[in-house]
């Protein structure tokens, strides 16, 4: 009995040791799995920390006192024109490099909420003062260019069309650099940019693909947070092979671009002491060929009273080469009289259409207010009066060029 018990003892010890070892292995495996889960969670959190997202949206309601067509308005309430939503994402590749993408969907009739990539670029900080970027970038022609679609960043319901509408292109595909020089109490920034861009027919008012090559320019900006001064120059070569056309109408002859040179000059300034705000820009755009050369300017005065910011804006634009187009109309008219035919009548009609669309003089007076009634949301109201068309149609429907033309706008802007 005793001998048998002693013979079984090594076996019992071995089994106990085996069970203990097995339990220890399971425990170790569980601990290892737990560590892996913790590492995976940390990795996911680390990747998530590299992403940042924000967005912006505008709901725009506008009504014209007649169908003058300013800002695509009609004599009925419309919510599509000027309404949009945008999303912007940034991924931190490393401590000095990031990738940025911005998509915008606009409600206007032509785009009908189709998402469009406005920004898509890599940004690299070479030094604390020098940043280089490459990809699809905003064309930095104006003071509000970086916030062109972000209505919440603007005091009024919209940027002045007479100035910002003088250039149809808003982005370029290429590269730029931004170099900041820190002074005692202010900063001077130098920006240079190069690239090219195609304006597709789907975004063109007259349904014609237009190519912009050899885009190049520079910006100098000085600010001390109260005062800001800015100057910009840009140039490009414009080409297209399709004559302008609108639905159910024949194309307008001689409206293509054959490597025509375009230039842009601009100066701007802003004063903001926390309550009183003054913003102004003066620009000149020149384009070879049939397209108009335009001088334009605006001044916005605003004053903040708690959550309310009433403002007044005066804007003016004037094409400076009307005589060239008017003379072309006269030549085509004489030719039509001397050689009456369908072809000469078509040529005269095209010349007259170019003159009617490209000869523009207009002054717009706008008064409105902004109400920041909730965090990150602003309600705005605006009344704009169009006048001083001179001998032109003022860029509105020719049937109403001699009428009082007014646009009423109510808008909600938000960021998130």
What are the language-model segments listed below?
Residues 35, 189, 201-206, 232, ...:
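A short secondary-structure junction signal
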Residues 73-74, 112, 120-124, 145-147, ...:
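Outer-membrane beta-barrel pore domains
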Residues 196-207, 211-212, 245-250:
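Active-site-proximal beta-alpha loop/turn segments in soluble metabolic enzymes
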């Amino acid at each position: 009995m005793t001998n048998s018990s002693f013979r079984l003892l090594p076996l019992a010890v071995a089994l106990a040791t085996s069970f203990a070892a097995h339990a220890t292995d399971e425990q170790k495996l569980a601990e290892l799995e737990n560590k892996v889960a913790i590492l995976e969670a940390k990795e996911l959190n680390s990747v998530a920390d590299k992403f940042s997202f924000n967005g912006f949206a505008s709901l725009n309601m506008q009504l014209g006192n007649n169908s003058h067509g300013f800002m695509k308005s009609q004599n009925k309430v419309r919510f599509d024109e000027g309404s949009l939503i945008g999303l912007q994402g940034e991924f931190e590749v490393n401590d000095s490099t990031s990738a940025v993408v911005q998509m915008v969907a606009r409600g206007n009739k032509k785009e009908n909420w189709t998402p469009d990539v406005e920004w898509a670029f890599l940004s690299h900080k070479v030094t604390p003062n020098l940043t280089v970027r490459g990809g699809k970038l905003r064309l930095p022609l104006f003071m509000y260019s970086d916030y062109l679609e972000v209505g919440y960043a603007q005091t009024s319901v919209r940027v002045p069309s007479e100035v910002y509408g003088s250039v149809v292109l808003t982005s370029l595909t290429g590269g730029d650099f931004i170099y900041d020089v820190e002074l005692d109490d202010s900063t001077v920034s130098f920006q240079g940019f190069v690239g090219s861009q195609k304006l597709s027919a789907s975004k063109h008012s007259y349904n014609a693909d237009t190519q912009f090559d050899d885009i190049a320019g520079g910006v100098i900006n000085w600010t001390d947070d109260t005062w800001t001064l800015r100057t910009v120059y840009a140039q490009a070569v414009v080409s297209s092979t399709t004559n302008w056309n609108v639905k159910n109408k024949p194309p307008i002859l001689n409206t293509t671009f054959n490597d025509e040179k375009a230039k842009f000059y601009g100066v701007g300034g802003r004063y903001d002491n926390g309550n009183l705000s003054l913003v102004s820009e003066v620009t000149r755009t020149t384009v070879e060929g049939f397209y108009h050369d335009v001088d334009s300017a605006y001044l916005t005065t605003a004053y903040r009273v708690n959550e309310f910011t009433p403002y007044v804006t005066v804007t003016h634009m004037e094409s400076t080469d009307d005589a060239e187009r008017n003379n072309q109309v006269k030549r085509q008219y004489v030719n039509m009289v001397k050689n009456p035919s369908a072809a000469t009548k078509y040529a005269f009609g095209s010349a007259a259409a170019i003159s009617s669309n490209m000869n523009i003089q207009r002054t717009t007076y706008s008064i409105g207010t902004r109400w920041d009634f909730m965090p990150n949301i602003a309600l705005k109201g605006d009344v704009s009066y169009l006048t001083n068309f001179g001998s032109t149609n003022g860029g509105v429907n020719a049937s109403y060029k001699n009428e009082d033309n007014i646009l009423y706008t109510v808008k909600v802007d938000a960021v998130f």
